């Protein structure tokens, strides 16, 4: 039965990132926490490293007003996310920061997969 052979691994790409790398990535703006990093410094920096042609810096906005919630609720209240979808600023993003992130987590993610599969 395939159910007996299937294996699923759930991991966040940022979990193996050392604290000192987080400090380097966020040396210009405060680290807002992973819940707020959607379309912010880390994800934008990764896109600048992987596919810079897809990053439109002129569209970056500074967002204010999103507040952390210690739980999840569905459906998500309409006022929980600003209209831009951005929860934290991306203004200090760079391809160099993206490469720093890649270099710090990729090998660790491969090790996790090698161990489990």
Question: Where are the regions a protein language model picked out?
Answer:
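Extended, histidine- and acidic-residue-enriched regions that form the cofactor-binding/catalytic faces
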Residues: 3-117
């Amino acid at each position: 039965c395939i159910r007996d052979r299937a294996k699923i691994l759930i991991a966040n790409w940022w979990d193996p990132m050392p604290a000192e790398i987080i400090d380097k990535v966020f040396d210009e703006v405060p680290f807002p926490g992973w819940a707020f990093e959607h379309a912010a410094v880390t994800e934008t920096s990764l896109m600048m490293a992987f596919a810079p042609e897809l990053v439109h810096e002129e569209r970056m906005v500074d967002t204010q007003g999103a507040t952390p919630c210690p739980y999840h609720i569905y459906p998500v209240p309409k006022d929980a996310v600003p209209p831009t979808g951005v929860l934290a600023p991306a203004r200090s993003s760079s391809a160099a920061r993206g490469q720093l992130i890649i270099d710090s987590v990729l090998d660790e993610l491969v090790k996790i997969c090698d161990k489990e599969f």
